[in-house]
Curated annotation (Swiss-Prot):
Transmembrane stretches, start-end: 23-43, 52-72, 90-110, 121-141, 158-178, 180-200, 228-248, 255-275, 282-302, 309-329, 351-371, 375-395
Subcellular location, record wording: Cell inner membrane
Database matches in PROSITE patterns: MFS (PS50850)
Highest taxon of source: Bacteria
UniProt cross-references to SUPFAM superfamilies, sorted A to Z: MFS general substrate transporter
Any single Gene Ontology cellular-component annotation: plasma membrane
Family the entry assigns: Belongs to the major facilitator superfamily. YhhS family.
Keywords from the named record: Cell inner membrane, Cell membrane, Membrane, Transmembrane, Transmembrane helix, Transport
Pfam families in the cross-refs: MFS_1
InterPro entries reported for this sequence: MFS (IPR011701), MFS_dom (IPR020846), MFS_trans_sf (IPR036259), MFS_Transporters (IPR050171), MFS_YhhS-like (IPR023008)
NCBIfam families: PRK05122.1 (NF003477), PRK12382.1 (NF009048)
Protein name: Uncharacterized MFS-type transporter PA14_38730
Length: 402
């Protein structure tokens, strides 16, 4: 007599919920970390441009410098995650976030000396960028360590929900804090959030270390470079919106630019929740092709927008399209290396979005100086279409035998 011991649907639902809860309990550190990034995001360009009196290129550089610091810190972050464990990396990252808030407080305190104030702000952005390199990848590694490699796409998706959700919440929150309390409140809130994240991470159980051969970082980087390039081209649209949407709206005489960041983040999260399993069903490259096509349409809307509401729709469509670009390319990239090099692979792959966001500020600022603010979104659209072409090429290559 045989007994059917397959899980019933309620048991399967319970197992899925347990996996999701385990993932959320770890990616909340990404949420906290990216909240410290989102709070100053909509305020700093105006602070540098209007209060300190510097130009749009330098205003963009202040935002982009954080991403450049993250890029440079990725190899170190990968070694920390694979060698010391994701928990240790999260603790280091939260401490760095708190330290960056102190530099921001100092910048506001010495605002009367613009050069010194800018220098303190730049140091704080560098520290925050290094902290981001630790927290984001470590949370993914911690989550995969808790629920297993088959759930990699789900962990990456939830980590993205946490990061962009935090930016969508943090941007308007930062504006409100400055309006109600003053510029000092940005730095103070970042210090408090970093301390909170450290306190929450300290008692949690670490994920087990995966033993095995550690590949040199440049070997890992070489394997994931094509996928990272697709991600980088898609990320230019997000970087353009995040850095310049406030100045773009001001140049058109439109109000409520911060709503574009919220619309981008809200649609980003909604798409990830609605289509969380699409990568497992369709494959990473197919999803990347669809998403980059949608993102390109959103950027075209922003470029051609006759009023702020069409611009808002363009930002929302861009967020919807960009939502699954990171996990779509990422799942394909992580599968190229052994599990013992997962942290290095995530760091190497994420490096490309840091590179993209790092150069977007000054590059797009230069484009805006030459051709006007509207031209930024046409430039970003062309970059997104280039990423789509690369995704098609990678998909075709992956289907070739051998």
């Amino acid at each position: 007599m045989s007994v059917d011991i397959r899980p019933t649907p309620p048991a399967q639902d319970s197992a899925r919920q347990n996996v999701t809860l385990q993932i959320v309990s770890v990616v909340m550190f990404t949420f906290i970390g990216y909240l410290t990034i989102g709070i100053p995001l909509a305020v700093l360009p105006g602070y540098v441009h209007d209060d300190l009196g510097y130009g749009s290129v330098l205003a963009g550089l202040v935002i982009s410098l954080q991403y450049l610091a993250t890029l440079l810190a990725r190899p170190y972050a990968g070694r920390v995650i694979d060698g010391l464990g994701p928990k240790r990396a999260v603790l280091y990252g939260m401490a760095g976030s708190a330290a960056s808030g102190l530099f921001m407080l100092l910048s506001v305190a010495i605002q009367g000396w613009p050069a010194l104030s800018l220098a303190s702000l730049l140091v704080g952005r560098l520290v925050l960028g290094a902290a981001e390199s630790l927290v984001g990848s470590a949370a993914i590694g911690w989550g995969i360590g808790r629920v297993g490699a088959p759930h990699t796409a789900k962990v990456i998706s939830w980590n993205g929900i946490a990061s962009y959700g935090a930016i969508a919440l943090g941007a308007p929150l930062g504006v409100l804090l400055v309006q109600w309390l003053g510029l000092w409140s940005m730095g103070a809130s970042i210090v408090l959030l970093g301390a909170l994240g450290f306190a929450l991470a300290w008692p949690k159980l670490p994920a087990p270390l995966v033993h095995g051969e550690r590949l040199p970082f440049h070997h890992v980087l070489g394997r994931v470079t094509p996928h990272g390039m697709g991600l980088a081209l898609g990320a230019i649209g997000f970087g353009t919106i995040a850095t310049f949407i406030t100045l773009y709206y001001a140049s058109r005489g439109w109000a409520n630019a911060v709503l574009c960041l919220s619309a981008f983040g809200g649609c980003f999260i909604g798409a990830r929740l609605l289509f969380a399993n699409s990568i497992n069903r369709l494959g990473g490259f197919r999803v990347a092709i669809i998403c980059l096509g949608v993102e390109s349409l959103g950027l075209l809307l922003l470029w051609s927008a006759p009023n702020p509401w069409v611009g808002l729709a363009g930002a929302a469509l861009t967020g919807f399209g960009f939502s699954l670009v990171f996990p779509a390319f990422g799942v394909e990239a992580v599968n190229l290396v052994p599990a013992s090099n997962r942290g290095a692979a995530l760091g190497a792959y994420s490096l490309f979005v840091d590179l993209s966001l790092g150069i977007t500020g000054p590059l797009v600022g230069f484009v805006a100086n030459l051709f006007g603010f509207r031209s930024m979104f046409l430039f970003a659209c062309l970059a997104s279409l280039s990423g789509l072409a690369l995704a098609i090429a990678l998909h075709r290559r992956s289907r070739r035998p051998g």
